[in-house]
Amino acid sequence: MNYKFDIPAQTKSIIKVIGVGGGGSNAVKHMHKQGIKDVEFIICNTDKQALESSTVPNKLQIGADLTEGLGAGAKPERGRQAALESKEDIRNLLNQGTKMLFITAGMGGGTGTGAAPVIAQVAQELGILTVGIVTAPFVFEGKRKREQAEQGIRELSEHCD
């Protein structure tokens, strides 16, 4: 007897890990250096210089027009607007056979706090199983940063499984 198996030829992994902002990008850079296979690692940032200096091969710059390649200045609304500006790029990136997405970000700053919920929303719209893994600021980093982080975590959790 002969058996024939039709195995789909995939060029992209079905599991993606995206690091959003500086903190998330640092986490993904560390994971990428560990040599984990069958996972696609991506860094996403408003800061063009930070993207260019990273060793992670898959990069997505968001909000290039809004931020002119600079960071979000610790302003989550600016990070959110940057992600909305690049929503179709995010959708195209995720719409390449992705079945599961891990979003990692440091909450309390601008890009991670503001953009991670938008990325999760796009993933949710595409029916992708989405997990958020974030860090919160230390108490000594201040009340404002802590409040921004808590708001960002609430928004992110609305779009995560």
Regions from the PLM with identified roles:
Residues 1-161:
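Tubulin/FtsZ superfamily GTPase core signature
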